[in-house]
Structure formats: structure tokens, C-alpha cells
């Protein structure tokens, strides 16, 4: 064997070792549907923002809880699969998914045309709207009242994406025609409370629940926006078509059994199941 062939053999061997180490961690590279793998391992990893109440968050006791946590656990219980919850940087969620670090994105994840280029979606299971939360004392009661005011938004959120995609709705009014970006909504709400920003573009479901839990919702005002209503969906790799089908099937089964409603009433006091 020549030195050249030996070198090529070594390089190929190293490549195979690296590829083997990645194994099923990079499922997109394999280009296969992974449902049988999830069934065999009886485990699936879901990425989420562990500050996004009431959808999925870390409680004071350190447990992961929330509407999406309960719903996902119920969905995969239908198939005898346990869920491993993996906190992630929400701004990197699609990268984490397609790199194989997580198997699903599930945490108040809105369906958008831009995201559809990167991931596959389940059917919608809940609807949501973007609002601007302001302090009642500020007398900011409309979008036009935000003229020259400082706006906050979460990086990578659907609200921030809409803010940039449709500048005539809100962006043209706010100070500097830009939003102060935050890693979490919790951080942004703290700044709103302390008057470091004048308004916060946020998911209505999050704001309503969070401020009610804080016991001071009357101190805040919800400004409606003209952004299109959103559908909450689960995001998967495009190769995982059977996984999508199984989740959609479980949504219907849980609703037919009344289990979806039970989870919904626990967190929202009503049935939020999407009819779409």
C-alpha cells in the first residue's frame, strides 16, 4: 500500500469514527424517518424555553411544568414513549433541531412561513395573538401612542419576526425604529416594570398568565396589534413525517377522550383546542 493510500485510509477511518460518534445525534444527516428509533428507545428529546409560562417553564422547586409539558407528556404516553425536556436558547431552536441536539421544538412555537423553510409542523393545537403590554399609568393605549417610545421584544420570537417583517404596523412608530432584544420575556417584563422600556411586544397567552400570577395585572394594559393571529404547533425535522402524523393523531385522541380539555382547564380555565 502506498503512502498516499495509507493516508487516505486513515482519513476515511477518522471520518467514520466521527460519523459513528455522531450516530443518531444528527438524524437529519441520515435523511431517514426516525419514528421506529423513538419507539425502540422509548424516549424523545424536546427543546423548550424554560422561562415561557404557562407553556413550559421551570418551577421554583426546579421541576419542569406548564401546559405544553403536560400536553407533550400525554401525547407520548399514548405511544409508551417518555419525554426528556431540554432547555435551549430559543434564538437557536431550529439549529438545535436540525443539528440533532433535540427531536422536537415544543413550547408556544408559532407557525410562520419563514420557519416552514427549516422545519415541518404538526397541525395547530392552540391559537395566540401578539399584544403590546404597557403600564396603565403610562397611558399608552394604542400603537400610535408608542411613537418615540422604547419597545422590547424577545429575540427569535414570532412577535419580533413580525415586528421586522411588517414595519408599517409598529416598527415605524417606536424609538429608533427598533426593539430592545431580550433572551427571555421574564427579563423584558422586569425592565417594563422598572420603566426601562415603555412597551413589550409579547404573546398574549404568556402575558395574561404571567401578570395574573404576579397579582398585578391591573397595573398593565394590553394594546391589540394588527399582526395576524398565530397558531401554536410542534416543530420537527422535515424527515420525521411519521412523528408528525403520530402527534396529530394523539391530539385528536386526547381531545376525544377529554384529556386535552382537562389539561387546558388546568392552565387556562377553558378549552383552547384549535379547531383548524
Where are these regions (language model features)?
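A ligand-binding cleft/hinge motif common to bilobed small-molecule-binding domains
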Residues: 92, 109-117, 162-165, 190-194, ...
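Ligand-binding cleft/hinge of the Venus flytrap
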Residues: 58-59, 72-81, 159-181, 211-216
Amino acid at each position: 500500500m502506498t503512502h498516499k493510500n495509507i493516508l487516505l485510509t486513515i482519513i476515511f477511518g477518522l471520518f467514520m469514527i466521527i460519523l459513528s460518534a455522531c450516530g443518531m445525534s444528527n438524524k437529519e444527516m441520515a435523511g431517514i424517518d426516525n419514528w421506529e428509533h423513538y419507539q425502540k428507545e422509548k424516549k424523545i428529546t424536546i427543546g423548550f424555553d424554560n422561562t415561557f409560562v404557562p407553556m413550559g417553564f421551570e418551577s421554583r422547586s426546579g421541576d419542569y411544568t406548564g401546559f405544553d409539558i403536560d400536553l407533550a407528556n400525554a401525547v407520548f404516553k399514548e405511544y409508551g414513549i417518555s419525554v426528556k425536556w431540554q432547555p435551549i436558547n430559543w434564538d437557536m431552536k431550529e439549529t438545535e433541531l436540525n443539528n440533532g441536539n433535540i427531536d422536537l421544538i415544543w413550547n408556544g412555537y408559532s407557525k410562520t412561513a419563514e420557519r416552514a423553510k427549516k422545519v415541518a409542523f404538526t397541525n395547530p393545537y392552540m391559537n395566540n395573538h401578539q399584544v403590546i403590554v404597557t403600564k396603565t399609568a403610562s397611558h399608552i393605549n394604542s400603537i400610535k401612542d408608542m411613537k418615540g417610545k422604547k419597545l422590547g421584544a424577545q429575540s427569535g420570537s414570532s412577535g419580533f419576526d413580525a415586528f421586522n417583517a411588517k414595519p408599517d404596523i409598529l416598527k415605524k412608530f417606536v424609538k429608533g425604529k427598533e426593539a430592545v432584544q431580550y433572551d427571555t420575556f421574564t427579563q423584558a417584563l422586569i425592565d417594563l416594570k422598572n420603566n426601562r422600556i415603555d412597551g413589550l411586544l409579547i404573546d398574549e397567552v404568556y402575558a395574561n398568565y404571567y401578570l395574573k400570577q404576579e397579582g398585578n395585572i391591573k397595573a398593565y394594559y394590553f394594546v391589540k396589534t394588527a399582526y395576524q393571529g398565530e397558531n401554536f404547533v410542534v416543530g420537527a425535522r422535515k424527515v420525521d413525517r411519521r412523528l408528525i402524523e403520530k402527534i396529530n393523531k394523539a391530539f385528536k385522541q386526547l381531545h376525544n377522550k377529554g384529556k386535552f380539555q382537562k389539561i387546558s382547564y388546568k392552565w387556562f380555565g377553558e378549552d383552547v383546542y384549535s379547531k383548524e
